[in-house]
Amino acid sequence: MPTIRLSVRELVEFLLRTGSIDSRFTGFDRANEGARIHRRLQKAAGEGYAAEVFLTAERTMDGIGFTIEGRADGIFTDEDGTVVIDEIKTTAAPTDAITEDMNPCHWAQGMVYGAICAEQRELETLDVRLTYYQIDTDEIIRYTRHFSAAELDAFLNDLLRQYLPWARRQLDWVEARNRSLGALQFPFPAYRPGQRALAGEVYRACAAGKAEQKGGTRLFCQAPTGIGKTMSALFPALKAMGEGKGEKIFYLTARNTTQAAAEDALARLRAADPALSLRSVTLSAKEKACLCKDAEGRPACLPEACPYANGYYERLKDALADLLDSTVPYDRAALTETARRHRVCPFELGLDLSEWCDVVIGDYNYLFDPTVHLRRFFDAAGDYIFLIDEAHNLPDRARAMYSARFC
């Protein structure tokens, strides 16, 4: 049976998130501060409070299997013996704006964790508590709701029912993709000297990584200029992915010119096999992708300043569907054109689209830089293939990424 794996947050936010992009409430500093506050509140809750509890459940709907998993911020039993799911949220919103219904996604996350917990512990009822921490005043505001296990189970099933068309779309795509990759041929009449050996080593590394599961395997390659390293890496990685030895390929580079080399290699594969089913996206820097900059030339990621940020999540699904129904490679031009048509941010659109793509091309920092790395992929385990171009540049880049900056 085909199966879709989803995190609780991914499921909830994709279906229920509304509103706008607002840089005042996002970013690395906010995320780090939120994590510190989470740990502080969890520690202060006492011995009976279990923090970061991993929960997973399996569901079947219309012939599709779903694996839903995530970590509940906290689970404890109150004085009345009721199990409580605690969902902690940090916010910069004014205290009087922190209402019980401020964000439906927050309740939804807690309710999905509650559904899984109730199923695992065979509970008839439980409570879901939202704990809001106001970061400017250190004030804590809590709201609690009581649910039956049947209510929570019905809620989770309703979310999955809403997600079904998207799940079916992705499963159908992966089946077509793997079938076309199985038939994919090397796009040149012959290999260059040393190219076949290099491609073979890349393929074996991808296959070994799948076999070893945790940690995968690593391959370091050094080859002379002109051997065709880009195709020697991409072609075998694609063949391995088509055989189920990886769900997504990340081609990471230090320079725009090497990103273009990856795009050119994929274009050659598509030209050699017009039936090839392959989604690739190139992630540009926010400064280059932005369609609305402030007076100083910086991205104006505020709903009151940018029409592409304002109401972004209301229009995102239509923009995604538009792109996923097309066959063009999702480069900067394609993202910009779609973003203008749907009035969404092209940078964020590229990030959201990357979850549906087979190949993601971008800068090293999307994997290695703790301030901008793609948390949607790398904060949890995934069956990924990483192709790191010009890896000799990594030490200098890593030193810059992990060095303190003083303003």
List the predicted regions and their residue ranges.
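Conserved pre-motif I regulatory segment
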Residues: 173-222
